[in-house]
Amino acid sequence: KSTVWGMSFRRGVPGVFEGEGPDAPFTPGSGVRKVGKAKRGVTGTRVRYWPDRQIFLPDAKLSWSKLADRARQTAFLVPGLEIVITDERGIQTDPETGDVLETVSETMRFDGGISEFAEYLATDQPVNNVMRLQGETSFTETVPMLDENGGMTPTDVDRDLGVDIALRWGTGYDTTVRSFVNIIATPKGGTHVQGFEQGLLRAFSAGLEGTRILKSSEEIVKDDVLEGMTAVVTVSLAEPQFEGQTKE
């Protein structure tokens, strides 16, 4: 949101989600002001923005496919959340009645969450049902905190960590891993993906140990485990550390 707002010359923040309500326009240099009241019992916020033409070319257009992909991704990551995306740029109306003749709209809701996400991402035939791995733990992190003298002091802080993973294997050879931290995509992976892959390798190695599936001279490697796998790895924790605005 901060990036979108930074590249807009005007943002409108009406006080209600649907219907009429007070509009609070913001432009570069404008301050906060009271513009009106919403009716009792009416809740929600609708946010609009207008692209800054000093940044974008006059013929720049929003990509429907990219917006739909992002909305679908969020719907997968938040089970039960319903997102409706509608393109009103090319609406055709009846010249006599004014009725809408054609519009593009898609409703997205996935109660199965990332299990459905893994099935959606997979491009091959499954060899097993989607497996779900979930867990919670806590850890201690040392962070600089402001002390009573105005200085920064290293302080131990307890953090809670949640992990939710959906994975399946298919008949293909490609590996697809999509990872997220607090529903923010991490396209280049990170320590959470490295830990997942290492843990998966250890689990397979331990499971095969003592069996006759592998010869004594053979050992399983990471590529053996990841081949044909589709996985969605999600982590939730307070104050994650990203590298830059791209959340890498």
Q: Which stretches of residues belong to each language-model region?
A:
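GHKL-type ATPase core
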Residues: 1-112, 116
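Short, non-transmembrane amphipathic alpha-helical segments
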Residues: 66-70, 200, 248
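Short, polar/flexible loop-turn hinges at active-site or ligand-entry regions and domain interfaces
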Residues: 53-63, 187, 214-215, 243
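GHKL/Bergerat-fold ATPase module in large chromosome/replication-associated machines
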Residues: 86-241
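Short, low-complexity, polybasic intrinsically disordered segments
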Residues: 240-248
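Core catalytic DNA strand-manipulation module of type IA topoisomerases
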Residues: 32-35, 220, 245
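Ser/Thr-centric signal marking residues that sit
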Residues: 43-45, 186, 191, 246
